[in-house]
Regions:
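Short, well-structured alpha-helical segments
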Residues: 25-30, 316, 392, 396-400
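Short acidic/glycine-enriched loop/turn segments that link adjacent beta-strands
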Residues: 417-420
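C-terminal engagement/docking regions of AAA+ P-loop ATPases
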Residues: 96-97, 105, 332-401, 407-412, ...
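Conserved ASCE/P-loop NTPase catalytic core
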Residues: 14, 18-20, 26-27, 31-243, ...
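Structural motif
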Residues: 16-26, 303-312
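Phosphate-sensing "switch" segment of ASCE/P-loop ATPases
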Residues: 199-212, 220-363, 370
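Short helix-capping and inter-helix turn/linker motifs at the boundaries of alpha-helical repeat units
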Residues: 2, 81-82, 355-356
Length: 436
């Protein structure tokens, strides 16, 4: 379907279904799909679940017989001489009733979701699933029986190459605090970063590489950024106001009273969108790009001071995904990633949402200790209490990655002649960088 603009058509589909406040959010989901396809092009020539691989015992090992993402091509994107991961995992952060689940279900709902495929086990379309409300480490990543074999059907393995949704991400973060799932967070971070799952257990190893993308919702008070989740997730911020709540009520009423003719038209448009996304995946896998070239405008945008160094790769992935989902696709040549007006607006909006979330904790620390000089040990304790939920090591890392980059924060060793340990003091204030 040459000329079919999936960004415009998906927005039309959502607006005619009376979705509220989605114009700056839907493109991120589409870019996530595009970057997921690109990641498969780059990494799925090696598959731990390929029944034809000489390293896989088809009778005893878990296999995915029909995977539409599996291919025999060489990697095309290897910055720093490493095999880069380009998945965009999405975290929707918003209060209860703000429409987080509705956005995820628009793509992943069984039957009606734009990515759902009834024949996914036969290799048609993506593998998709809405995750359970409660999950353990063993249920997510696997455990072994007395003979060292992986038990059950761990989600991270089952959804390799697909999309896994969670209506409330706290079900996973809460599980990591229980004795039976202490390693949940570390396994999650690693599997989202490079796909590796590796657990040493008394009876054997849980070891495989998976390539699933996570879309999840969370409420602000339940969102923990202290352990590296912020580097693995693209954050979409959803605010809720009395006016927006009234708009939601009106939208629900209109959607309930939709005419039959309109429902039929929207069903056909949904089928078109499903078909286009599936065809784009199949076309790109069969005829992949030969490399990636970012133009200077992309580099200039990423060089902006408000984009932190560890965030630049997330926005680079967004740009890749955006171009993988353009109306006209050309394989067999490098993917030229340019900065058009729509991509620039998408990057600007995404950065603004990310700053709102990422800087909330920093503003709390700044306003609490403004114009004070505190011992470094006390600052670490306060950050641990206020930001990182009692994790002392995460608090020290948070200070290094966030506070130390601010012009209003300065660490110094006081000039004093008194005996004993001097220690480091931390100054919060407009003159933090002045000579002490």
């Amino acid at each position: 379907m040459s000329g079919f603009d999936v960004f415009d058509k998906t927005l039309e589909f959502a607006e005619r279904n009376y979705y509220i406040d989605i114009a700056d959010k839907l493109p991120v989901f589409l870019c996530s799909i595009g970057s997921h396809i690109f990641n498969a092009i780059n990494k799925c020539s090696r598959c731990d679940f390929d029944p034809d691989s000489p390293l896989v015992d088809e009778e005893n090992d878990f296999t995915i017989i029909n995977c539409p993402l599996r291919h025999g091509n060489l990697p095309i994107y290897t910055p720093h001489s490493r095999l880069a991961d380009t998945r965009i995992n999405i975290m929707l952060r918003g209060p209860k009733g703000s429409g987080k689940s509705i956005l995820i279900l628009m793509f992943l709902a069984e039957g009606a979701g734009l990515l759902d495929s009834p024949n996914q086990d036969m290799g048609v379309g993506f593998r998709t699933m809405m995750g359970p409300n409660s999950v353990t480490e063993a249920g997510m990543f696997g455990s072994v029986d007395e003979e060292g074999n992986i038990m059950g059907r761990p989600l991270a393995r089952e959804l390799c190459g697909g999309f896994l949704g969670f209506e409330e991400f706290s079900s996973m973060s809460d599980a990591s605090k229980k004795d039976h799932s202490m390693d949940m967070k570390n396994q999650l971070l690693t599997s989202l970063d490079n796909g590796r799952v590796q657990k040493s257990m008394r009876a054997g190893w849980v070891q495989y590489t998976t390539r699933y993308t996570v879309w999840a919702g969370t409420q602000p008070a339940r969102f923990e950024l202290d352990s590296g989740l912020d580097r693995r997730f693209f954050i979409i911020d959803i605010d809720m106001t009395p006016q927006k709540e009234r708009e939601y009520k009106k939208a629900q009423h209109r959607a309930s009273n939709m005419a039959v003719e309109e429902r039929v038209e929207l069903a056909n448009l949904g089928i078109e969108l499903k078909s286009w996304i599936r065809n784009r995946m199949e076309t790109a896998i069969a005829n992949p790009p030969t490399g990636v070239i970012f133009d200077d405008d992309i580099g200039e945008w990423l060089d902006h001071p408000t984009v932190r160094s560890f965030e630049s790769d997330l926005f680079r992935r967004l740009a890749i995904g955006y171009h993988m989902m353009q109306p006209d696709y050309h394989g067999g040549m490098p993917l030229l990633v340019t900065l058009d007006d729509r991509l620039r607006q998408l990057l600007d909006d995404s950065l603004a949402m990310r700053r709102t979330v990422m800087d909330a904790d920093m503003e709390l620390i700044r306003s609490t200790f403004w114009k004070q000089d505190l011992p470094k040990s006390q600052v670490v304790k306060e950050v641990s209490r206020m930001v990182t939920n009692g994790d002392y090591q995460s608090a020290k890392r948070w200070i290094t990655e966030n506070l130390e980059l601010q012009s209003w924060y300065y660490e110094y060793e006081p000039n004093t002649n008194r005996r004993g340990r001097k220690g480091i003091l931390c100054r919060f204030g407009p003159d933090a960088g002045d000579e002490i």
